[in-house]
Amino acid sequence: MKRFARKETIYLRGEEARTLYRLEEGLVRVVELLPDGRLITLRHVLPGDYFGEEALEGKAYRYTAEAMTEAVVQGLEPRAMDHEALHRVARNLARQMRRVQAYEAHLQTGELRARIARYLLFLADTPLSARDRQGIYVTVSHEEIADATASIRESVSKVLADLRREGLIATAYRRVYLLDLAALEREAGSALEAA
């Protein structure tokens, strides 16, 4: 088991893929750096999920994996895995594929406001969420929301300010409080599957 701090890189695009990973605790995102310098989130890895699947083929990692929270990760040697273990990996990757397809639809449908609402509701069901006296919140930056909604930070900040003015959310440093879940769900239009 290995611990990673928030924002720490687990592997980089182009590195030789020798290890398949299983997330034990926390939240990881798989990202790609675009030619224009923007970072986009391709998928979120939840506890129990496998990632770094390029190791199953003995290829280089195609994307970069980064911890979004403190994360505990188990490294696995694919050649040492038995048939049943590989079957568990395949089932998990199939489940992740369904989430990725839902995520693709999320990015391609609706205005930015709807995409942000869907993403905040999605994060509420991940290790990025917590509760305090003010209610349920997610720990996320404007930049991370932009990366996950095919947008830019400035546009995200404007939408969050509008949602805050309307009483749907409140914000603090790296926290977005979800004050009116029903209204956010109406804004979202459809759910982004977390599990």
From Swiss-Prot:
Q: Which UniProt keywords apply?
A: DNA-binding, Plasmid, Transcription, Transcription regulation
Does the UniProt entry include the keyword DNA-binding?
A: yes
Q: Which SMART domains match?
A: cNMP (SM00100), HTH_CRP (SM00419)
Entry's Gene Ontology molecular function annotations: DNA binding; DNA-binding transcription factor activity; protein homodimerization activity
Q: List the disulfide bonds.
A: none
| GO cellular component labels | cytosol
Q: Which residues form the HTH crp-type domain?
A: 110-182
DNA-binding region extent: 142-161
- CDD domains in UniProt: CAP_ED (cd00038)
Q: At the top level of its lineage, which domain of life is listed?
A: Bacteria
Which Pfam family is one of those matched by this entry? cNMP_binding
- Check the record and name the SUPFAM superfamilies matching this protein: cAMP-binding domain-like, Winged helix' DNA-binding domain
Subunit and partners: Homodimer.
Question: What does this protein's UniProt record list under function?
Answer: Activates transcription. Positively regulates PcrtB promoter upstream of the crtB operon in a cAMP-independent manner. Regulated genes include genes encoding DNA photolyase, phytoene synthase and cytochrome P450 monooxygenase, which are involved in carotenoid biosynthesis. Positively regulates the light-inducible gene cluster in the megaplasmid in a cAMP-independent manner.
Tell me what this protein is called.
Answer: Transcriptional regulator LdrP
Species per Swiss-Prot/TrEMBL record: Thermus thermophilus (strain ATCC 27634 / DSM 579 / HB8)
